[in-house]
């Protein structure tokens, strides 16, 4: 399940499919459909919408449908990690672990929260580190949303420059986000060869 930030994953793989073609093509349905590679927008909501816990039961209801053939489940945050407490994240991790134990044939993908510009001392980073440590220690599968937004495609690191989810960052250390690493990278690389045009909610 996802809302707007999680939609970046779907629009991204859809654009890769259009840009590169086979073997990156895939089948898609908006809702549940057996035999389809990606069932999008089902279950509805995200990890904090309408609350921080009901997504787990919606996952059970989804997987318990007759004929269900899903072997991967991935839930996305929107902005809820930014104001999450340690207890909130413990709840998330515990619910994920319970689902893994109940459905051993399904791979559950954990996720960090997207960047919010608060830097390495902000609550978001602390909570993301909590998720990362749990996944590392437990051998979990993690889609590290924040980490992806922290590096450009050449591996240049922006995490210490207060980057946000739009790829804006503080270029000169004055506390103002005055540059955008995604636009800079695109402008120095060739469209259609190094990168492709793709809509991305909230981002470049």
PLM feature spans:
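Stable alpha-helical elements in mature extracytoplasmic
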Residues: 5, 9-12, 73, 88-95, ...
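Substrate-gating cap/lid alpha-helix
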Residues: 113-154
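Extracellular/periplasmic catalytic domains that process cell-envelope and extracellular macromolecules
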Residues: 18, 65-69, 101-103, 135-137
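Structural recognition of the beta-strand scaffold that forms the well-ordered cores
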Residues: 1, 6, 24-31, 37-43, ...
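Well-ordered, non-membrane alpha-helical segments in soluble/globular domains
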Residues: 51-59, 85-97, 122-131
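Histidine-centered active-site loop/cap adjacent to the catalytic His
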Residues: 165-204
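Oxyanion-hole/transition-state-stabilizing segment in secreted/luminal serine hydrolases
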Residues: 52-89, 116
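Charged, often glycine-rich, active-site loop that binds/positions anionic groups
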Residues: 34-57, 157-163
């Amino acid at each position: 399940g996802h809302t707007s930030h999680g939609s970046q994953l779907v629009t991204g793989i859809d654009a890769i499919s259009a840009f590169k073609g086979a073997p990156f093509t895939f089948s898609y349905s908006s809702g549940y459909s057996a035999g389809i590679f990606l069932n999008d927008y089902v279950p509805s909501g995200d990890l904090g919408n309408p609350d921080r816990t009901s997504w787990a039961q919606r996952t059970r209801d989804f997987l318990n449908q007759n004929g269900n053939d899903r072997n991967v489940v991935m839930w996305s945050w929107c902005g809820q990690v930014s104001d999450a407490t340690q207890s909130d994240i413990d709840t998330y991790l515990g619910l994920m672990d319970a689902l893994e134990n109940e459905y051993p044939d399904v791979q559950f993908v954990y996720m960090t929260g997207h960047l919010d510009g608060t830097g390495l001392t902000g609550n978001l980073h602390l909570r993301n580190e909590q998720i990362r440590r749990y996944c590392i220690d437990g051998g979990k599968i993690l889609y590290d949303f924040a980490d992806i937004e922290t590096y450009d495609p050449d591996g240049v690191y922006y995490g210490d420059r207060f980057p946000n989810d739009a790829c804006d960052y503080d270029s000169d250390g004055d506390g103002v986000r005055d540059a955008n690493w995604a636009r800079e990278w695109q402008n120095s690389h060739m469209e259609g060869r190094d990168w492709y045009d793709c809509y991305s909610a909230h981002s470049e």
